[in-house]
Amino acid sequence: MWKYVRKYLYFAIPAALFMVGEVSMDLLQPGLMRRIVDEGVLRLDAAGAGGLDLIFTLGLTMVGLVLFGGMCGSLNNMFAHLASQNIGNEIRKDCFRRIMCFSFPQMDRFGTGSLVTRVTNDITQIQNFVAQFIRGMIRTTMLVAGSIFCMFRLNRQFGLMLLCAFPLLAGCMAVCLYKAGPLLPRLQEQLDEINSVMQEDVAGIRVIKACVRETYETIRFGKANDALVGTQLWVLVIFAFMNPVMNALMYIVVVLLLLSGSVQVGAGTTTPGAVMAAITYTTQMLNGILNLVMLFQTLTKGAASWKRVREILDTQPELADSDFEGKTAAGAGVEFRDVSFGFPGAGQTVLRHIDLTIRPGETVAVMGATGCGKTALVSLIPRFYDVTEGAVLVDGVDVRAWRQRALRDRVAVAAQKSELFSRTIGENIAWGAPGAPEDALRTAAVTAQADGFISAAPEGYGTMVAEGGASLSGGQKQRISIARAVLKPAGILIFDDSTSALDLKTEADLYAALKAAKPETTKIIVAQRIATVRRADKIVVLERGRIAACGSHEELLRTCETYREIYDSQMGEEEPHE
């Protein structure tokens, strides 16, 4: 954390100095009060004269010290929060940048809910940690040490009594922190769980309602929430027990001071003002220790949060970047050389010994049963994952040798799930090509068969999209996603089952418009419908992670039983084999 703190020492150091000023003013107050009592109040005669001038002068001095201390405290608070907010801002930006570099498996390992909690709640805890450390640590240390020092200067016996009380107070605090310490990291983990459940349920609310699972999900959330509340209550009980115990110890010390002070005042070895000052110093020390307890609670939470945030910052991207930039071309060739692949941590191979060559400008369709590896295959081209064996080449260069940004600039993907952002329709389409002119944006929408419903909207391309595209139908979301891919100036265009929500006529019109608009672009289409793939230059049939057959529609009807079965199930009754 030091690398973040040192950048804002120009806030932290003034904050510390102002806190020294505030605590110094607090420690001067009991001494002035002693003089007011001993040299002012006790010397007043029956007419009220005698020490009145001294009382007035010292009283004004105390008011001045209070005002000066308050000003120092305010400035300390301001500079401490400037330091903590800026440090938190830097950490948050670094975390987000690192998350943006994570591979898909790394994202899966952390989990969306956990990442959100770490970048929001955990960094807030770190900000509180920094602010409280700058404010609380200096104040507490000076109050405790200063109170004991001033007590010894005031009266050695009083100082010894206070010094003897300190281990008891500190021991009580240590026991509570020992009990509460392990619970604080658990709070963060349970908060992760609540966030994960909440995100899943909000995102899947339509499925939950359709399956009538509201009660089940309510119970699941309730269990996670009850676990969090249970841990919070244990922490509260521990600290609730500590406060009365420490207050009782303080009052015992005060009573002992009064008894000892009374004896010493009677013997003439001390003064009533000194007894009052001793009680004030005792109260200041106890307040310092109580503040230390709250400070350690904040520090423990902050340390646990920093450990979780460091897990993000210390995680190196799994996909090492290279420096090959490639060249600009309308189409790009793709080659799979003996490629095998399994999702990290899944323990099984999804693709086995894939050999496939796709020429620039060629349209290739990929078909197969659910789970045969179609999405995995096309995900290797933009290097969303690394192959387990073999190599994937784009323009004759292994994708691992490409700079990732340059490679993904060459590939446009319309994914299975249409991800839309809470922005206008036009901004969503231009997401992959920021700054694209309006006529290009409209042309892409026309190609994707989306211009009709967009133009019919009240604000056209300026219509805001609800979160997750909730205001649009499935087919509309898919067409906006396709328009986004079409607009991007890429050499390879991947449609990963991205027309599944479209009717056959709209889909046919879309592919006809796409062929006319991007004749030189390499197109890879993952689909389930024969009508979608039959006009492709080449159709790849996957079966259990292997290429079962590859050829044109007519060739596969003659040579591939799997393809013929798919054809018969979908279109066999509509037209004869060709």
Predicted regions: what they are:
Residues G48-G51, K327-E578:
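ABC-type nucleotide-binding domain
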Residues L44, Q85, K93-T117, N121-I123, ...:
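Short intracellular "coupling" helices and adjacent cytoplasmic loop segments at the cytosolic face
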Residues K7, F11-S24, Q132-L187, L256-T270:
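Transmembrane helices of ABC transporter permease
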Residues R43, C150-C164, W234-K307, I312-L313:
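Helix-loop-helix
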Residues L17-F18, M25-D38, F56, L65-T112, ...:
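Juxtamembrane helix-loop junctions of ABC transporter transmembrane domains
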Residues K7, C101-P105, N121-V130, I134, ...:
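An intracellular "coupling" helix at the cytosolic face of ABC transporter transmembrane type-1 domains
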Residues V20-L28, L67-S74, I126-F129, F133-A145, ...:
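Hydrophobic alpha-helical transmembrane bundles that constitute the permease/transmembrane domains
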Residues R6, Y10-L75, F79, F152-F158, ...:
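Transmembrane helix-loop-helix hairpins at lipid-water interfaces of multipass membrane proteins
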